[in-house]
Amino acid sequence: MTYKGKFHPTNLNKYKGDINNIVYRSLWERKFMVYCDDNDDIVEWGSEELVVPYISPLDGKRHRYFPDFYIKTKNGDKFMVEIKPKKYTKPPRPTKTKRLTKAFMHETTEWARNRAKWSAAQDVCKKHGWKFLIITEDHLKMTKYLYGG
């Protein structure tokens, strides 16, 4: 099941972007928004506010990637953040039930597209002295214990 909705921050001055159109596309993204809004170490954040051009390995054409988040911390560090289920952060592997099925082919093309996006994001971050992070549910579960989310 996909969860989608609008987020309404309590710390309006921290959000960089359209405060009336902060959309989350999963409960993990919503959880990260709460974390950014409530965490005193994060002084600035945005959701899908950055654009990273990349070349898709699927069609060889230039496309635009909108990373899930941008954050800036108190000490000046800047991060580009992608929230992804852990299973989508690794190459798909065929199993006895998942040989060259339609689902496996879809996972393979998505993996190739994501690798191209993430490589382009890492290049942009390196150029600007930022860090690129892929955050999974494992990381977000930890925030429950650290920040009560």
Where are these regions (language model features)?
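Electrostatic, structured charged patches in enzyme active sites and in nucleic-acid/phosphate-binding
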Residues: 1-149
